[in-house]
């Protein structure tokens, strides 16, 4: 996950944030492994809202750079979709940043059946 969320430089703070804030909101992490080494992770939660209904939302999807292209991201996305079905969700969503460095990820998303259905707008509140 540190390859994706580079602003967390302190491992203990990252773990605290996941355990104390994310997990109580239903956040879970699953991984893909090469032997004993975790090479890809997906962080997800089930959300409920009036616009989408029950939705499995992927907050985080990250594969170590040296293991990209081996199918780990695809496998995790497919697992998450199936988990959403198991939990009775009717939608599967994720947001992705934009820019040339995201093209490989976007290709994966399109190739796994995801489509762009909305713009996600944001502004800092500082």
Per-region residue spans from a language model:
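Acetyl-CoA-dependent GNAT
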Residues: 1-53, 77-78, 124
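Non-catalytic, surface-exposed connector residues within folded enzymatic/regulatory domains
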Residues: 12, 52-55, 70, 88, ...
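A short, internal acetyl-CoA/4′-phosphopantetheine-binding micro-motif in the GNAT/acyltransferase core
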Residues: 48, 61-68
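Conserved acetyl-CoA pyrophosphate-binding loop and the N-cap/start of the following alpha-helix
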Residues: 67, 71-79
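Conserved active-site alpha-helix within GNAT-family acetyltransferase domains
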Residues: 74, 86, 90, 98-119, ...
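Hydrophobic pocket-lining residues that define ligand/cofactor binding sites across diverse proteins
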Residues: 80, 84
């Amino acid at each position: 996950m540190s390859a994706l969320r580079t602003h967390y430089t302190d491992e203990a703070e990252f773990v605290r944030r996941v355990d104390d804030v994310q997990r109580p909101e239903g956040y879970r992490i699953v991984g893909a492994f090469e032997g004993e080494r975790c090479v890809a992770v997906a962080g997800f939660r089930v959300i409920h809202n009036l616009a989408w209904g029950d939705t499995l939302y992927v907050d985080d999807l990250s594969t170590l750079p040296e293991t990209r292209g081996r199918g780990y991201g695809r496998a995790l996305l497919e697992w998450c979709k199936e988990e959403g079905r198991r939990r009775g969700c009717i939608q599967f969503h994720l947001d992705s940043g934009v820019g040339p460095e995201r093209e490989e990820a976007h290709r994966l998303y399109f190739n796994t059946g995801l489509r762009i259905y909305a713009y996600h707008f944001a502004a800092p509140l500082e």
